[in-house]
Amino acid sequence: MSQENVEVVRGVRIALSPASERASQRRALDERLAIRFPSLYRLLADALMRLPPRSRLRRLVLARRVRQAYAASNRRDIDAVFVGWDPNIEYRPSEDLMPPDLEGAFHGHDGYLALWRYWRDAFDDIRWDPEEVLDLGDRLLVETQQRGHGSGSGVAVSEPVFQLFTFRSGLVIRQEDFRDRAKALEAAGLRK
């Protein structure tokens, strides 16, 4: 491979294995504890995000937490998703995935739920399967595969979506989605 075809990206890559069947169907003990004791979860999440990205402990816990968060989303367990999100989160879905009548940014848990209802109306079985995480310190870039079938047409959809999460005090304060990897890397500050 020639040198000009190699793209150097900073950050720590974490390859993800698929979530277990059990995790896909129900909450794990640590998820139940996080929901029951959100203040404790926030303290631990903040401590985790303060570890250096190359820390083995950070990589292991982040891999588990990312798999759990996506499994919770895929099983429609919103409480398990929101435990890791700031109440004032800003969510920016990919512009080319949104119809023109919906706003470009959604704010707070209520804004996310409004968008979630839109996705559920459009796709009966929409899901996101995380494949890789790029740990950038206070941000994570997660490569996912979005899958589903159109509610009216039944047409299958499967495409990559890159989700950039920004953290503060261990909680997600911003999520941006991209269909294009280059745009996601640029938004993460990794390309000029």
Regions found by a protein language model. Name each.
Residues 1-192:
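C-terminal and inter-domain tail/linker signature
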